């Protein structure tokens, strides 16, 4: 029997700082798919905020350190379509005209996968053992859907869970208004977008909102809370792993 594939988990800034439980859920799911998981301590930001702001020098520096930190692994997995999209789609272009670094970036990007896509498309996971009663709706993040083609995969795994009912909101594939630094630079536009999104979430009748990107979830959860909605928000990894003992995103920890 061959050695298990080695996965380097790219935790992401938001998961590290605001929702570590997503990282632990990701580790559980990856291990259950038959892999070993490490969390390289040298990792930092993927560089997307700098990249979207036009700061190629800092983005490149972050890319170099990330590539070096993960080169020894068979796969690089991130519980975020946004960060995975940055690592997979944009790193090679930072090194155009530099054959050595461009080749390293290409080899790195070929190993990068978003978490749920990795489970379904790479490891062939068709169902999970976790159970969870309730009604859920799913938001497709812009980067996950448009850069990586992630849409059917999370729904397939959620459909395999006993007790879980998935209902589709209207325009599930439309932006939530977060967009990283977009929500800071254009707050009025961002607010109008998320207001429409939360209206669709409430109208779905779901008790819980799921998504694969913590930035989107924090944005939508904040708006739902300000509107007085009873809908809770969770990262899809937590539900798939059966690790829902933490308060919902934006919720208060019990004392």
Sequence positions of predicted segments:
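Iron-sulfur cluster-binding electron-transfer modules in prokaryotic oxidoreductases
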Residues: 1-255
């Amino acid at each position: 029997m061959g050695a298990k594939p080695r996965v380097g988990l790219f935790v992401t800034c938001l998961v590290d700082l605001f929702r570590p439980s997503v990282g632990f859920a990701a580790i559980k799911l990856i291990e259950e798919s038959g892999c070993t998981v490490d969390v390289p301590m040298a990792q930092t930001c993927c560089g997307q905020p700098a990249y979207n702001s036009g700061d190629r020098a800092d983005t490149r520096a972050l890319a170099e350190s990330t590539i070096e930190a993960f080169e020894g692994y068979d796969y690089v997995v991130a519980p975020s379509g946004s960060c995975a999209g940055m690592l997979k789609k944009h790193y090679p272009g930072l090194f155009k005209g530099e054959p050595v670094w461009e080749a390293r970036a290409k080899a790195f990007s070929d190993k990068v996968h978003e978490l749920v896509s990795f489970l379904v498309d790479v490891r062939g996971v068709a169902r999970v053992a976790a159970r969870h009663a309730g009604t859920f709706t799913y938001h497709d993040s812009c980067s996950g859907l448009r850069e990586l083609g992630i849409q059917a995969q999370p729904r397939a795994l959620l459909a395999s869970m006993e007790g879980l009912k998935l209902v589709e909101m209207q325009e599930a594939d439309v932006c939530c208004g977060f967009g990283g630094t977009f929500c800071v630079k254009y707050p009025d536009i961002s607010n109008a977008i998320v207001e429409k999104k939360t209206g669709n979430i409430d109208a779905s009748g779901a008790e819980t909102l799921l998504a694969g990107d913590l930035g989107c979830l924090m944005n939508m959860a904040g708006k739902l809370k300000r509107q007085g909605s009873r809908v809770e928000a969770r990262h899809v990894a937590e539900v798939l792993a059966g690790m829902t003992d933490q308060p919902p995103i934006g919720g208060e920890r019990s004392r």
